[in-house]
Amino acid sequence: FSKFQTNKKTSLSNVQNYIPIYDRFFSLNNTNYNSINLNHLWSLSDIKEKDGDKSENIFNCKLKNISDIEDFTMTQKVFFKMAPLLDPFKYIVGKYNHTDEHLFNLPSFDKSIRVHPKIEDTNNSSYIDGFFCFLTSQMLNSHSFIHGVDYYGSFLAIKNNYKVNIIDDLDYLITSE
């Protein structure tokens, strides 16, 4: 995942493997906490390029088959699902303290690093959503579940220039205090 740290195509920074929900499934320690991934069939090995101007989230990627001892790879269009750790609408209407210097800190295995409690919560909707994507991929690849989506891994990062479509929520934003 080190290639994602320097990839300017994604506009991501501070990319990390550690996700708090992993605390429920793995025995994490200071040496392994940032190298754990769920057991999925394909993983991202490289991001080649953004796929046109139609979407900020579709990339041509090199995928590696995890179970193949011959290191079989393929290139495919991949949708990157961006799931914010904090509700952007609550942020816009001022439900979060904008002056909190720890508001945008990513969670860490090192509990001395201060982060917003919602970001640290293993039940954060973004972590649950990512785990659900993993489970549907398992069903797709192991049980031919036709409504599953392929899962290539989860990472946490800061999305620079994050955009939110507020058109359907204008009434809420205008009337909220």
Name what the model sees in each region:
Residues 37-38, 43-177:
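Conserved ATP-binding subdomain of kinase catalytic cores across diverse folds
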Residues 1-67:
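Juxta-kinase regulatory segment immediately upstream of eukaryotic protein kinase catalytic domains
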